[in-house]
Amino acid sequence: TDCGMLQRIKVKQQWASVYSSGIAREDFGEAIWKAVFALAP
């Protein structure tokens, strides 16, 4: 779907918040890949 400029900024800000640095970044990345492999092993 198409996103407006405000939606793009909001998503970018949310990703920056979640995928910032350190342990939170590692935990988030690991959770994403576990979900990917669970859906398509």
UniProtKB/Swiss-Prot annotation:
Keywords: Heme, Iron, Metal-binding, Oxygen transport, Transport. It comes from Lamellibrachia sp. The keyword Transmembrane does not apply. Residues 2-41 form the Globin domain. GO terms for molecular function: heme binding; metal ion binding; oxygen binding; oxygen carrier activity. The keyword Heme applies. This is Giant hemoglobin AI chain. It comes from the Eukaryota. Disulfide bonds: none annotated. Giant hemoglobin is composed of four heme-containing chains (AI to AIV), and two linker chains (AV and AVI). Belongs to the globin family.
